[in-house]
Amino acid sequence: MRLIPLKTAQQVSKWAAKYIVDRINTFAPTAERPFVLGLPTGGTPLQTYKELIKLYQAEEVSFKYVVTFNMDEYVGLPKEHPESYHSFMYNNFFNHIDIQPQNINILDGNTDDHDEECRRYEEKIKSYGKINLFMGGVGVDGHIAFNEPASSLASRTRIKTLTEDTLIANSRFFDNDVTKVPKYALTIGVATLLDAEEVMLLVTGHNKALALQAGVEGNVNHFWTISALQLHRHAIFVCDEPATQELKVKTVKYFTELEQRAIHSVLD
């Protein structure tokens, strides 16, 4: 496990974007051997997408041979709805880079057969071998994608009922009206995430501090989905200072010293 303790959320976004670009460029993808990137939605990664667009515009990276898989999508929300994750991804990222449309994969929450859609998604991921890097965010209760507390750590892509806490948290995108938030979503499973070669979680803000503490110092258990990343062979938590406030001082000190070079790659 790596923990990258930075000062601000802006530094988190820059570090994450640079890391993604470095991984893509080192991989040197081709049409026959694309780089497979897992992506989230939500407020936390939004600035990272802006940083990635800047790096693309500066010709530091191309997404032509990058294949993407998104984490989740609401059930029953039309793709063209402004709060669908299809709309989010195209408006905030895909429309601004050179990714090929056929390389974009997002779950279809409007299909008549949700189980078949989830099975198809898993098979599509397997057809590429693996996801090379999965970027994600985390909820205040430690959920990743829509793997809410008590989700099976062996779960695969499936339909999930959203918790009341998630409905309330997401209502800010629906005129603060909980009744407008879809009650169900299709989401990758915890095991789907753990299958990725690398997982990078962005954790910012004091409201995420308990989740980060559970992920780094807590025991592995299904009530804190984030804790499953302790089982991953290459998990990276990129966090700002407020998010580290529930960690032990010696934990932060240890990773700060260990990751000096990585930290200064953003600060310099």
From Swiss-Prot:
Query: Is Flavoprotein given among the entry's keywords?
Result: no
Activity regulation reads: Allosterically activated by N-acetylglucosamine 6-phosphate (GlcNAc6P).
Pfam families in the cross-refs? Glucosamine_iso
Q: Name one GO cellular component term.
A: cytoplasm
Gene3D superfamilies named among the record's database cross-references? 3.40.50.1360
Listed GO molecular functions? glucosamine-6-phosphate deaminase activity; identical protein binding
The record ties this protein, via HAMAP family, to:
GlcN6P_deamin
State the name under which the record lists this protein: Glucosamine-6-phosphate deaminase
